[in-house]
């Protein structure tokens, strides 16, 4: 039997590793981000895993078969299923606007400076936190949110500093709870720390 879709299994880690490599290529080409991109990510994350119900794979809440799916994080409830479609539309519009600005602010192939990194981190944090707030899938929202953050980071010359599995520690969990309430500032603070730790582990460039 395939491992459960929530289990930290070798199959899940393999799916995430392969997906991150694909996302890296898309990021380098600066492909236009869409919510359909994340739908594909969630489907690939769940490949060869046992879902509670197969209809939840690759489906946004509120769509056929998921009309009544409601989820919460520590009893903080997310966007209601009938409102997910509109929330995703607004998310995509705002993300495209942010990316259009950053595409000009950070030239392709350039190493971002401190001011640029600050803006990149903010956009990564906003996208991650807003995805967590909407919680568009029945499962896999945290993983896809972290993929959004890494996709944007790699698009602008930063490493994929947000761990995919296991879930990051430190202030990440509390930041997620704040994100459910619409506050993405704690996520930005957690991401700045993660990036510093990631770069410290790599050591100085030679």
Predicted regions and their residues:
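FIC/Doc superfamily catalytic core
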Residues: 1-139, 143-206
């Amino acid at each position: 039997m395939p491992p459960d879709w929530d289990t930290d299994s070798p199959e899940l880690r393999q799916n995430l590793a392969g997906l991150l490599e694909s996302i890296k290529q898309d990021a380098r080409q600066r492909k236009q981000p869409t919510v359909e991109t994340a739908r594909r990510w969630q489907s690939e994350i769940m490949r060869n895993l046992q879902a509670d119900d197969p209809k939840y794979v690759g489906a946004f809440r509120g769509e056929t078969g998921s009309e009544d799916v409601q989820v919460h994080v520590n009893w903080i409830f997310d966007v209601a299923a009938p409102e997910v479609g509109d929330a995703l539309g607004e998310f995509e519009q705002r993300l495209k606007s942010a990316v259009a600005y950053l595409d000009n602010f950070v030239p392709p192939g350039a190493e971002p400076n401190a001011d640029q990194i600050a803006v990149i981190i903010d956009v990564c944090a906003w996208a991650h936190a807003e995805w967590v707030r909407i919680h568009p899938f029945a499962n896999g929202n945290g993983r896809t949110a972290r993929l959004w953050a890494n996709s944007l980071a790699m698009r602008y010359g930063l490493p994929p500093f947000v761990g995919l599995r296991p879930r990051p520690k430190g202030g990440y969990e509390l930041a997620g709870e704040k994100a459910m309430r619409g506050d993405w500032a704690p996520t930005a603070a957690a991401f700045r720390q993660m990036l510093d730790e990631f770069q410290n582990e790599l050591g100085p460039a030679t």
